[in-house]
Regions:
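Surface/interface-facing alpha-helical segments and adjacent flexible terminal/loop regions used
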Residues: 1-193
Length: 193
């Protein structure tokens, strides 16, 4: 059984890898971090009693090339892509997700810049903020943020990705996102008992 501190560091590493994947999938080291995130997520899933067979199968897959992942990313999520990575484009979220996220980042003393080239409510930014909160050893704030933001629309995003025939690598990423939602829900249930 992992200690809560170790569990939070594991969650932090997964969210950090997902932030990189959904902001710059072609950057050096991103796919290796993805592979590590799959392993860590499988371990976390096992800890909370979630079956790991699907993640174990993902671990066995060879890594694609950065170029193929970038091309698929552009096809799915680019300006003309059919799937949005912005919370503001999904139902069930707050009135102005971008402004709400910006406020949350500022409350956490994080500078908000457009250096990364993505809006504040972009999935990569949300995952990055989760990683920061967990790294700062503030899991309660991370869980509240997850429940208010990505947790509200990730299931719909997962379905949208899976419904796209051109999704190959990101179909696997959707599986990882789905498992993360299950892990987060399981962690909340465990706290309530």
């Amino acid at each position: 059984m992992a200690t809560p501190l170790l569990e939070n560091y594991a969650r932090q590493s997964v969210f950090d890898a997902l932030a990189a994947l959904f902001i710059r999938p072609d950057a050096a080291g991103v796919l290796e971090r993805w592979a590590d995130a799959v392993k860590v997520t499988a371990a976390l899933a096992g800890e909370v009693g979630i079956p790991t067979a699907t993640l174990d199968a993902l671990r066995e897959k060879p890594l694609p090339t950065a170029e193929s992942v970038q091309a698929e990313y552009e096809t799915l999520f680019g300006e003309e892509g059919p799937v949005s990575l912005l919370e503001s484009d999904w139902p069930k979220t707050c009135d102005d997700p971008r402004a709400t996220c910006r406020l949350e980042y500022l409350k956490a003393d994080l500078a908000v810049t457009d250096e990364l080239g993505v809006p504040e409510d972009h999935l990569g930014m949300l995952c990055g903020f989760m990683a920061v909160l967990l790294l700062r050893e503030n899991p309660d704030a991370a869980e509240r943020f997850f429940d208010r933001h990505p947790g509200k629309w990730l299931p719909a995003l997962v379905d949208a990705i899976r419904n796209r025939p051109e999704a190959v690598f990101f179909r696997d990423a959707a599986t990882l996102l789905e498992t993360i939602c299950e892990i987060e829900a399981s962690l909340r249930e465990a706290k309530n008992y």
